[in-house]
Design a protein with these regions (language model features):
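Ligand-binding cleft/hinge of the Venus flytrap
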Residues: 55-64, 86, 129, 146-159
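Secondary-structure junction motif
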Residues: 122, 135-156
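Alpha-helical "hinge/linker" immediately C-terminal to small N-terminal DNA-binding modules
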Residues: 3-31, 37
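N-terminal winged-helix
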Residues: 27, 33-63, 67-72, 76-80
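Short beta-strand-to-loop elements that line the ligand-binding cleft
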Residues: 67-74, 93-94, 138, 159-168
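Short, well-ordered beta-strand segments
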Residues: 35, 39-45, 90, 114, ...
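Short beta-strand-centered segments that line the small-molecule binding cleft or hinge
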Residues: 13, 17, 32, 54-58, ...
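Hydrophobic residues within well-ordered alpha-helices
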Residues: 5-8, 42, 82-83, 131, ...
Length: 186
């Protein structure tokens, strides 16, 4: 028998709720724009590429006369696009507080520590301070993930050793699997 882990069960429930969330979002867009045809420019952080394409397929079927233009970049670049008002919709964590914008919570973005299968902490309940002596692989400065991790470390006074910074969650996962260090990913 194959069974999902508790984290897998949580992910499954989250994925199942994405369609409902997207339908509510589509209705909100309808109300805001009365949009039936034209172009919708969407800028999203790189981590949103894991769930947004499925939702966009549903949107395109519902609104075949609306062309989508996507910009996928790290948080820093998306914030700059927001400041320049380049797009119609922005998908990110932690939008800037200094802008007068409408914020619509979309989806919880939980972070987890990723470790090689044989690591001593696998299966254990540990906190980030417990892992302070371990080398970490982080997303690059300017990414939403790095922003969230840095913010958490500043709030808690936690210091982690950064062995390497990368712009790819996939590369980070592969390097973690090879034993190069731990990571905190969404």
């Amino acid at each position: 028998d194959i069974a999902l882990s508790p984290a897998g069960e949580e992910l499954l429930q989250t994925v199942r709720s994405l369609d409902d969330i997207w339908n509510r979002f589509e209705s909100a867009i309808d109300e805001l724009k009365g949009l039936k045809r034209g172009k919708l420019r969407v800028a999203l952080v790189t981590t949103a590429k894991y769930f947004l394409p499925r939702m966009l397929g549903s949107f395109c079927k519902r609104y075949p006369d609306i062309d989508l233009e996507l910009e996928i970049a790290n948080r820093e670049n998306i914030v700059q696009r927001l400041r320049n008002n380049q797009d119609d919709l922005y998908v990110m964590s932690y939008p800037p507080d200094d802008l007068d914008i409408v914020r619509m919570p979309f989806l919880d973005n939980d972070y987890v520590v990723v470790a090689p299968a044989a690591h001593w902490a696998v299966g254990q309940q540990v906190s980030l301070p417990d892992l302070a002596a371990e080398p970490f692989l982080f997303r690059e400065q300017g990414s939403g993930s790095r922003h969230a991790i840095d913010r958490h470390m500043n709030e808690t006074g936690t210091q982690l050793k950064v062995r390497l910074s990368l712009a790819s969650n996939e590369a980070i996962r592969d390097l973690v699997a090879s034993g190069m260090g731990l990571a905190v990913l969404s």
